[in-house]
A protein has these predicted regions:
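Active-site HxH/HxHxD metal-binding segment of metal-dependent hydrolases
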Residues: 1-104
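Short secondary-structure boundary/capping segments
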Residues: 24-25, 111-113, 133, 176
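Soluble, non-transmembrane catalytic domains of enzymes that act on hydrophobic metabolites at membranes
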Residues: 9, 17-24, 110-111, 159-166, ...
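Short, solvent-exposed coil/turn elements at secondary-structure transition points
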Residues: 10, 39, 107-109, 127, ...
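Metallo-beta-lactamase
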Residues: 96-99, 117-197, 201, 206
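A conserved mid-domain beta-alpha-beta active-site/ligand-binding segment of alpha/beta enzyme cores
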Residues: 102-106, 110-115
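C-terminal regulatory/interaction regions
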Residues: 208-211
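Short, solvent-exposed polar/charged micro-motifs at secondary-structure junctions
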Residues: 11, 113-114, 195-196
């Protein structure tokens, strides 16, 4: 863990950031946490988290499909309530490591080098405004946060639990057109693999009755 230089947060939700402080305590004092620039307002307490849609039709099925991955309660022992997308929690949680945070400013670019190996940052808003992914052109891998979720059969689907369904669909279409991806690591669920195009195994929102 002492060799970890960066911790990359795909978006500012508690299930993705709630354990970062615990991990940081085991890393070097030089380790930085990377967020998309859109998350700065949340972290500094100047902006509320974007409201989420489809709690019942989007979130509940995901919990049902993935709850068995929780090995013990320590896996959900979050260090603060930062990242809960409900107004009632807006003043109840601040990150305990704000001095270790850096921001990725894409400046309108589709891809941006961020300093580690062949990985590039890719803006993927839709699930949240600050959602950002990692893409490796050499290995054709994509770490996509909660834009895409995986199923037990190796397929995937666009996440209906989101801030903006249309934006998520548009973002997915752009990624499919521009990137060559054979392996997708979703925020929840099984890894999605295909020898030619892993996006072909992802069900768009319109095919799930999302529109």
């Amino acid at each position: 863990l002492e060799d970890i230089r960066f911790i990359f947060a795909t978006h500012f939700h508690i299930d993705h950031i709630g354990g970062i402080g615990t991990l940081l305590n085991k890393c070097s004092s030089e380790t930085r946490v990377l967020f998309d620039l859109h998350a700065k307002g949340y972290i500094e307490g100047q902006e509320n988290l974007a409201p989420m849609k489809n709690w019942l039709s989007g979130l509940v099925p995901t919990i049902r499909e993935n709850y068995t991955r929780i090995g013990n309660l320590s896996h959900i022992a979050f260090e603060s309530l930062a990242g809960v997308p409900l107004p009632v929690f807006k003043d109840n949680g601040r990150l305990p490591y704000t001095d270790r945070v850096s921001y990725i400013d894409m400046q309108g670019a589709l891809l941006s080098r961020i300093g580690f190996s062949d990985w590039e940052a890719v803006p993927t808003p839709g699930h949240t405004p600050d959602s950002i992914s990692l893409y490796n052109e050499k290995t054709q891998e994509l770490i996509c946060g909660d834009l895409i979720l995986g199923r037990h059969d190796g397929t995937g689907y666009l996440n209906r639990f989101c801030w903006d369904e249309d934006l998520a669909s548009d973002c997915f279409a752009i990624l499919n057109d521009v990137l060559c991806v054979r392996t997708i690591y979703p925020g929840h669920g099984e890894v999605i693999r295909d020898n030619v195009n892993a996006f072909a195994k992802v069900i768009p929102l319109e095919e799930k009755g999302g529109k």
